Amino acid sequence: MYKTKEIAQIVGVHPNTVRIYEEWGFISPVPRKNNWYRVYSDIHLFQLKVARTLFQCEIVQGNIRKMARDIVYTCGKEQFGKAEELTQDYLSHLKKEYEYALVAVKVVENWLHKNPINDVRQYTRKEVARLLDITPEAVRNWERNGLIDVPRLENGFRIYGEKEVEQLRVIRSLRSAHYSINSIHRLLSQIHRPSPNIIEILNSPTENEDIVTVTDRLVKSLEEAIEGANETLALFKK
């Protein structure tokens, strides 16, 4: 049996976190002594370890955070078999997201080594959006965020050539893999230096970036999340 302070020290969280986890249903209801002090069991310790391990992953996009929370809720209901199954699904999902992230990097590498395009075809924003199966608003947003600089005609209308189409294709691939706007902006500003390491650039925020999110280190964050999912499965096997 454990007191709140003792079990918090074992897991490495603040005692208030333990109380909040009970309130939110992340662990089973905790019995009280006559003096109203909480008394925790090994089941509570196990549930806290699961929550602590999974919540170290800060990625919120692509349903990842919700899947982790569902595992913790299920474990809190003492449905350990189901929680283990959900963890397997979560691990599979993380591995797919990781593959998507690496595939997007390949798209960038292929783009870099492609021969210059001499095609003279030109598109409006609406046409290029339809071509790439994205919305005109997405294209406008990427322009607004400085991911692409689009030339204008004399009348002020933007016109997209094959060079812009290829760059938009790269941006779309990276965004679909959940890379942040900051990461893509950083990549496109450094892409033409000799032998760029695409993954390193995408995962290395600069000192000039005011806000750094976990998706600015997407590949590394996914690797850490996969490690956490494997650690959680190991807890279920004990």
Where are these regions (language model features)?
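Major-groove DNA-recognition helix of helix-turn-helix-type DNA-binding domains
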Residues: 16-34, 135-156
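Non-catalytic alpha-helical scaffold/packing segments enriched in small hydrophobic residues
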Residues: 127, 137-141, 170
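Aromatic-anchored, glycine/proline-accented short structural segments
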Residues: 142-176
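Arg/Lys-rich, alpha-helical DNA-contact motif
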Residues: 2-11, 23-24, 28-34, 38-124, ...
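Residues within the helices of the helix-turn-helix
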Residues: 4-5, 19, 126, 140
